[in-house]
Regions:
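Glycine-rich FAD pyrophosphate-binding loop
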Residues: 1-16
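A structural preference for short, hydrophobic beta-strand core positions in alpha/beta folds
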Residues: 3, 68, 100, 137-140
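Glycine-rich active-site loop/strand segments that organize a redox cofactor
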Residues: 12, 16-47
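Flavin (FAD/FMN) cofactor-binding and adjacent substrate-gating region
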Residues: 27-34, 56-130
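Helical element adjacent to the flavin cofactor pocket in flavoenzyme catalytic cores
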Residues: 89-94, 111-162, 166-167
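Short glycine-rich, flexible loops that bind phosphorylated cofactors or substrates
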Residues: 171-173
Length: 173
């Protein structure tokens, strides 16, 4: 396995993250339930729950010292408690441990918040450093295209049996 990194490892979103590992991705569950249906929404939830568990398992199995800890995650509003309540209802219907609250760990008051229990936080750069020590990484290698097992980069092409995209923004349309 190799990693192609367009810049330097950890220089993008990883360095500027909130360090939360969470199934909370803005107000998505009510909309997803309504627009995509319950089955697809449940699949989305399931994938996110598996990812959360994978982080925990990887940290334990590889003994990665990255300050990994279980904690709650909050999504809040300063103006619309009803929207937050609808999101909580959808999340609970989809099997997520979530509750409406006005109490958070934030240093300011909110009109409403979703508390997602059993989420996690960690030091992402320590985590990434431990992973990077076990991988072959080509930094400053921008992927410009992918076609059926062939990856095009600004430094040449790579053949691959499988390709995983792990970027903050899509690298192509």
């Amino acid at each position: 396995m190799i990693v192609l990194e367009g810049n330097r490892v950890g220089s993008g979103q990883t360095a500027g993250t909130t360090a939360k590992i969470t199934i909370s991705h803005n107000l998505i569950y009510e909309k997803l339930f309504r627009e995509a249906g319950e089955e697809k929404a449940r699949k989305y939830v399931s994938a996110n729950k598996r990812a959360l568990k994978m982080y925990s398992r990887l940290v334990q199995e590889e003994q990665i010292d990255c300050d990994f800890r279980e904690c709650s995650s909050y999504l809040y509003s300063l103006t619309d408690a009803e929207q937050i309540k609808r999101e909580v209802e959808a999340a609970v219907r989809l099997g997520i441990e979530a509750e409406f609250t006005t109490k958070t760990e934030l240093p300011f008051s909110v009109i409403g918040s979703i508390c997602y229990q059993k989420q996690a936080a960690f030091h992402p750069l320590l985590f990434l450093k431990a992973l990077a020590e076990q991988l072959v990484i080509y930094e400053h290698t921008k992927v410009t295209g992918v076609e059926e097992g062939k990856i095009y980069t600004d430094h040449g092409n790579v053949l691959a049996d499988a390709v995983v995209f792990a970027s903050h923004h899509p690298i192509m349309n």
